[in-house]
Amino acid sequence: MAEEHDNRNLPWVEKYRPNKLEELISHADILSTIDRFIKEDRLPHLLFYGPPGTGKTSTILAVAKQLYSPKEFNSMVLELNASDDRGIGIVRGPVLSFASTRTIFKSGFKIVILDEADAMTNDAQNALRRVIEKFTENTRFCLICNYLSKIIPAIQSRCTRFRFGPLDNQQMVPRLEHVIQQERVDVTEDGMNALVTLANGDMRKSLNILQSTSMAYDVVNEVNVYTCVGHPLKEDISNIVNWMLNEDFTTAYNNILDLKTLKGLALQDILTEVHKFIHKVELPTKVRIKLLDKMAEIEYNLTAGTNEKIQLGSLIAAFQVTRDMIVMEAS
């Protein structure tokens, strides 16, 4: 009964995390290769890389659960998030002491899982390289990261690398439908499309959005999903572009500022959606290039932490210049 209660309070990303390799919904080629390694008892050191929410951690945890019973799991598997402690201490401390000891009741190797390994310093990675070399006989390492370029070549060459790409819609929808059925959530068709669109290939993100929207609203539809995550709706973007192109600067600025405040929108999200909108509209090539170049500059400024109101003014100005260029070309 207690376990059932615990399960009910779990975040859905953990509650529905796959426990076996066959339960994973994507990357069949990677899974079949790893399954063959396990069956032939030839599991190498592994390096999983790719964007978040694509099944990297779930895959190695499913491998560990396949290799060890629940009783053995804690003594045979060390799971660390490298971004908690990025320095050399994590390698010389918990990793070294775990890798260097043998267990008495289980033959074979232990597994060390280092999540977010790309956050480790170069010194820590060099120390890890030596530990990997020294304890290969009784320990296998699995490094998980988003950016392969941040892992030193010496570690890359000692691991078998697998890239986990973003999931496509056909893979995400059945898994979402399974969770929706289990949790008895009322989801509309446009709500499902919104979940998949906003997740952008990230299964974890789609489940988190689904759970938070279902807790905030009785029905998970497009408007409620976008409102819950504070993302602009299509009609909002249509209005914003319309104001920027057809109203004077002050009116457009005040209208967009009011909408941002009312719905709690971030300029970064507005910029992303406006960018998609621009590619669907007929514009002269020269005009489109100039506008996209200016939008890229604004996005760069936003990532540097500049004032949103100033960048909003810059965005509106870019569109007003675009309008004048279109008028000049037409005449």
Question: Could you describe each region identified by the protein language model?
Answer:
Residues 1-161, 171, 295, 299, ...:
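P-loop/Walker A NTP-binding region and its immediately flanking N-terminal helices
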Residues 239-331:
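Helix-rich C-terminal "collar"/helical-bundle subdomain used as an assembly and partner-interaction module
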Residues 232:
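Conserved beta/loop motifs at nucleotide-recognition and modification sites
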Residues 112, 192-198, 204-218, 224-226, ...:
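C-terminal helical "lid" of AAA+/P-loop NTPase domains
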